[in-house]
Design a protein with these regions (language model features):
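Active-site beta-loop-alpha junctions enriched in small/polar residues
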Residues: 40-46, 72-74, 103-105, 127
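Catalytic beta/alpha-barrel core
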Residues: 15-16, 68-72, 77, 100-102
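Short beta-strand segments at enzyme active-site cores
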Residues: 34-42, 66-71, 100
Length: 222
C-alpha cells in the first residue's frame, strides 16, 4: 500500500537488500537462536529492480529460517500472473525453505506451482477469503487423497457467522464489523443474487445484522 511504501517500509525494502539483512539480523538477535524467524517478500520493486535473490540471500545470511515469495514486483501489485521462474530462481539461490505465494486459489493450482518451482510449500492469502476449506482440499491433493467436494450452503453460512463472531470477540464489535463487511462479501461468491447480497454486506453494523444477512442468503437461494 502507498501509505506503507511511502514510509520506506513493506515492499519498498526490496530496493535495499542490505537493510533487509540488517533488519533480519536485529530480529534474530532479539528472538535468540531457537525461535523461528520467517520473511515474506516480493520478487523485486519493478522490472528493473528484480532484487529477490539478493534480498533472499541477505535474509538467509542473517538468520532467517524460511522465506515466502510473492511472485510479483511491487509495481505489478496483483494484476499479471505470478512469475513462476522468478520464484524458482530465488528458491535455488538459498538453502533454507522457500514458500510460493500468489494466485493460489485451487488445490490443483497449489500442486502445480510446487511442481514448477520446487518450493517447500505454499502460502495462501487472498485465495482463502470466503473459502477456508481451500487448505483441506490442498492437503488432500498433496497427500493423494480424494479432493473434498464444495461445502454446502449451510457450511458456508456457519463459517461466515463463526468467523465474524470470533472477530467481534477478539476486537470488539465496533472495530470488527467494518472489517467484517469485506470478509462477508467473499462468502457471497457464486450465490444467486450475489450483487444485492454484497450490498447488504456493505451495510453490516452489528453482529445481529449477520443473522439477517444469512436469512437473506437462504431466501434468495430458494
Amino acid at each position: 500500500a502507498p501509505k506503507i511504501t511511502s514510509s520506506g517500509a513493506g515492499s519498498k525494502l526490496m530496493q535495499n537488500p542490505e537493510l533487509c539483512g540488517r533488519m533480519v539480523a536485529a530480529a534474530r538477535g532479539a528472538l535468540g537462536p531457537d525461535k523461528p524467524l520467517t520473511v515474506k517478500m516480493r520478487i523485486g520493486w519493478d522490472a528493473e529492480q528484480l532484487t529477490g535473490v539478493a534480498v533472499a540471500r541477505q535474509c538467509e545470511a542473517n538468520g532467517a529460517d524460511l522465506i515466502a515469495v510473492h511472485g510479483r514486483t511491487r509495481e505489478q501489485m496483483y494484476i499479471p500472473p505470478i512469475d513462476v521462474d522468478a520464484i524458482t530462481e530465488i528458491r535455488k539461490a538459498v538453502g533454507i525453505p522457500v514458500l510460493a505465494n500468489g494466485d493460489i486459489t485451487t488445490a490443483e493450482g497449489a500442486k502445480q506451482i510446487l511442481e514448477q518451482t520446487g518450493c517447500a510449500g505454499v502460502m495462501i492469502g487472498r485465495g482463502a477469503l470466503g473459502d477456508p476449506w481451500l487448505f483441506e482440499r490442498i492437503n488432500a491433493v498433496l497427500t493423494g487423497q480424494p479432493e473434498p467436494g464444495e461445502p454446502s450452503l449451510n457450511a458456508r453460512m456457519s463459517a461466515l457467522r463463526a468467523q465474524i463472531y470470533e472477530m467481534c470477540e477478539e476486537k470488539g464489535e465496533w472495530t470488527a464489523m467494518p472489517q467484517a463487511r469485506g470478509q462477508a462479501m467473499h462468502y457471497m461468491k457464486g450465490l444467486k443474487g450475489a450483487a444485492s447480497l454484497r450490498r447488504y454486506c456493505s451495510m453490516l453494523e452489528h453482529f445481529t445484522d449477520v443473522d439477517k444477512l444469512i436469512e437473506a442468503v437462504y431466501k434468495l437461494q430458494g
